[in-house]
From Swiss-Prot:
GO molecular function, one term: monooxygenase activity
Function: Cytochrome P450 monooxygenase; part of the DMATS1 gene cluster that mediates the biosynthesis of a reversely N-prenylated monomeric L-tryptophan (r-N-DMAT). Seems not to contribute to the final DMATS1 product.
Binding site for heme: 466
Comp. bias (Basic and acidic residues): 430-441
Region: Disordered, residue numbers: 430-451
Similarity annotation: Belongs to the cytochrome P450 family.
Disruption phenotype: Does not alter the amount of produced r-N-DMAT.
Signal sequence interval, chain numbering: 1-31
Matches recorded under Pfam families: p450
The EC number(s) this enzyme carries: 1.-.-.-
Induction (UniProt): Expression is negaticely regulated by the global nitrogen regulator areA.
UniProt protein name: Cytochrome P450 monooxygenase FFUJ_09176
Length: 550
């Protein structure tokens, strides 16, 4: 007997009709989006005559002349919020306004947080173990990012690192005070700043310090980090522009032989430090403070990392990331104080009135808001990573009337944004007062949903924003306050204002190099006596640490 098919209820009929209508609307909307994508044009691009290399010769020439940041600033002024350059087979898009950053890096973070393929830096020098170079979709990136936050850079741990920062900067003041020749020679001064930044972070990560300015480990770590960062710059390695070169036999790829040799050397160096820390723990001789590596060792899950050896390698990468940006920021601050002595004098008076005859500490920052303004302006004026570390897109990104295609490389062009006169009037001048009333930390400012209210873009934007902002605030604040309190900052004899930044270019675009004509001199015998007394007391109370060597 045939079964009677039940008729749908009135409610079900209405629901099916609504669902069908929604499907049609979604289909039409998708079709319109596809049509819109097809209609939208790519952003503008500077003209170039070289069909094969594109803009690569122009970019490489600018890099050789230490003017890469200026070239991309010029193009931003000519072509607007977004433009692209063709570097061989690769298109690099530069994001040059705060609103474009908000739309592309923040709101579209799920599609703009991957990294390009860096054959030399990521795959060969780092063997895909460097947090900075990994794509955000990779398991290793997620586990390393989590371990970094919970093991080193969260607010509580940033505060826990203050005793090391205070000791190392105090040692720096004492070293320059006891050896005036160090303060008069830029190379020696650069090394002294490097010592205290590396020692501050190696103490927190490995429980091993860097007691001497001439320690080979300073140059070793700096050179290791520089090799990785330079390999991320547009056009630095031709194999990253023309990937087909990677298919050559090894004997025709000197860059790969050198890169893999570097990784082997660096990984062995990190494993040696791990072995040292483990032996200290086993012998009951480890420093009493909890280090990053010790947290990883004692955590049953190693803070989510794959191995202790990989954790040690991450530790080295964190020293590089924290120390090098801290040193570059301090060096650029000195350039600003030389170039704008009125700002230097005002900042020094503010410090003197707040702390008197004692050495400043981080907690004094809340009492001297002008110093926070100086910090913000320093980072705006000389961003340590001027052109941003490139991201890649995982789908087409629409911004206004432009389409950035899937697979494109995108740069947050901090240098150009920081030089936008509509955002920062008179951008070439160093004017801390432009941040008057802004008492926010770097984290608070970067999290502002109103992008026009953010102080600067030094820490990036979106999902990949630098997790070290709490650490950076403390490191930079203590350095700035103590240098101003302790020293006269003056030009090298024979040097006159205005300074030409192109006469002392640094390794990183837009930042000063070792030829910076700076001299630090202790302000008075009384200041020197205070420094000596406080340093002697700090030495007596400080826990014993073995040196970082290798």
């Amino acid at each position: 007997m045939l079964q009677t098919i039940p008729m749908p209820s009135r409610e079900l009929t209405i629901a099916l009709a609504v669902l069908s209508l929604l499907m049609v609307l979604v289909q039409r909307a998708g079709s319109r989006r596809r049509e819109t994508k097809q209609l939208l044009s790519l952003p503008p691009s500077p003209p170039c005559a070289n069909i094969i290399a594109g803009h690569l010769p122009t970019v490489l020439k600018a890099a050789k002349e230490h003017r890469q940041h200026l070239l991309f600033q010029k193009w931003a002024e000519e072509y607007g919020e977004v433009f692209f350059v063709q570097l061989g087979t690769i298109q690099e898009y530069f994001i040059n306004s705060d609103q474009a950053v908000r739309a592309i890096f923040d709101k579209a973070a799920a599609q703009t947080s991957e990294r390009p393929r860096w054959i030399v830096s990521n795959e060969q020098i780092c063997n895909r173990l460097n947090l900075l170079l990994l794509s955000s979709s990779e398991k290793a990136w997620k586990s390393q990012r989590k371990a970094t936050t919970f093991g080193l850079t969260n607010l509580n741990l940033a505060d826990a690192g203050l005793p090391f920062l205070h000791f190392e900067t105090l040692k720096f003041l004492n070293d320059i005070g006891q050896n005036p020749s160090k303060g008069a020679d830029p190379q020696s001064l650069w090394s002294s700043i490097g010592r205290y930044t590396y020692s501050t972070f190696s103490s927190q990560i490995f429980g091993l310090d860097v007691p001497e300015d001439n320690s080979p480990v300073i140059d070793y770590i700096f050179e290791t980090g520089l090799a990785q960062i330079l390999g991320m710059l547009p056009g630095y390695y031709l194999v990253d522009t023309f990937n087909i070169l990677d298919k050559l036999p090894l004997f025709l790829k000197p860059w790969e032989r050198d890169a893999k040799s570097r990784h082997k050397r660096d990984y062995e160096w990190c494993c040696d430090k791990l072995k040292k820390v483990k032996s200290q723990i086993d012998a009951g001789e480890a420093p009493p403070h909890m280090t990053f590596i010790r947290r990883v060792i004692e955590d049953p899950n190693h803070l989510g990392l794959d191995s202790l050896e990989d954790a040690s390698y991450l530790g080295m990468m964190l020293i590089i990331g924290a120390s090098d940006t801290s040193r570059i920021s301090t060096w650029s601050f000195l350039e600003a104080m030389l170039t704008f002595p009125d700002v230097c004098n005002k900042a020094r008076k503010v410090i003197d009135s707040a702390v008197g005859d004692r050495v400043p500490v981080f907690e004094d920052l809340e009492r001297v808001p002008y110093i926070r303004q100086v910090m913000k302006e320093s980072w705006r004026w000389r961003p340590p990573v001027a052109l941003g570390h490139p991201h890649t897109t995982t789908r087409d990104i629409m911004y206004k009337n432009y389409r950035i295609p899937k697979g494109a490389r995108i740069h947050l062009n901090a240098w150009a944004i920081h030089r936008d006169p509509t955002r920062y009037p008179d951008p070439e001048n160093f004017i801390p007062e432009r941040f008057e009333g802004d008492t926010r930390s770097s984290q608070e400012s970067a999290a502002s949903p109103d992008v026009s209210k953010r102080d600067h873009f030094v820490f990036g934007a979106g999902r990949r924003i630098c997790p070290g902002y709490h650490v950076a605030d403390r490191s930079f604040a203590v350095s700035v306050m103590r240098i101003l309190w302790a020293f006269d900052i003056s030009l090298k004899p024979g040097t006159k204002l205005p300074l030409d930044p192109q006469s002392f270019p640094g390794d990183m675009p837009g930042n000063p190099g070792l030829e910076l004509p700076v001299v630090l001199t202790v302000r008075s015998p009384e200041r020197l006596e205070t420094i000596q007394k406080e340093f002697e007391a700090a030495v007596q109370s400080r826990e014993r640490m073995e040196p970082l060597v290798g």
